[in-house]
């Protein structure tokens, strides 16, 4: 069976084999749609993989967008998200960014985390992976490689104490849809 892949905010660099969605008509999008307009033009449980690379930081209604992603994803589907880390110069330099991310951004949707108890949403995910600067700088050497490795192994301590001393650029999530 062929995996159905949806790329939200594909811009002009849509991944091969994906159906692209973007707000801009002159993008590579197959579907032109504003991610802050609900519902999305897809059925329930339709997608096996949803890609959200550098797009969710631009939406106004983050929780509603995550709920829509959950609605249109099949049970067990993979959702990949990347966005600017809270101490990244890229977060602060782009006037269209509405939010930054930390390793705990999706905890509100993950059972067993302290933030889940607030009950913001019925959308549920399992965290498969969370990495700082994944694939961003594959040739980092020496001190940079050591510090990035340390930050990825000690996320809470890094975010609480050292994020502005040694800022990373992006945070990447791989989530599994739970229904």
Where are these regions (language model features)?
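S-adenosyl-L-methionine-dependent methyltransferase catalytic module, highlighting the catalytic core
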Residues: 63-64, 68-70, 74, 78-179
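Conserved SAM-binding loop
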Residues: 2-88
């Amino acid at each position: 069976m062929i995996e159905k892949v949806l790329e939200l905010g594909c811009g002009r660099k849509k991944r091969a084999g994906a159906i692209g969605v973007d707000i801009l008509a002159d993008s590579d999008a197959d579907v032109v749609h504003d991610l802050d307009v609900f519902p999305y033009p897809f059925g329930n449980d339709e997608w096996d993989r949803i890609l959200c690379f550098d797009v969710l930081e631009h939406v106004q209604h983050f929780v509603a967008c995550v709920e829509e992603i959950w609605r249109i994803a099949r049970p067990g589907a993979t959702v990949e998200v990347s966005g600017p880390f809270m101490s990244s110069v890229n977060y602060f330099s782009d006037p269209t960014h509405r939010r930054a991310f930390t390793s705990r951004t999706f905890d509100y949707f993950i059972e067993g985390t302290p933030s889940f108890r607030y009950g913001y949403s019925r959308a549920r995910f399992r965290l498969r992976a969370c990495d700082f600067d994944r694939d961003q700088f594959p040739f980092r050497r020496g001190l940079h490689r050591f510090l990035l490795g340390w930050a990825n192994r000690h996320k809470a301590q890094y975010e609480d104490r050292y994020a502005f001393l040694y800022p990373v650029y992006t945070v990447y999530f791989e989530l599994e849809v739970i229904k």
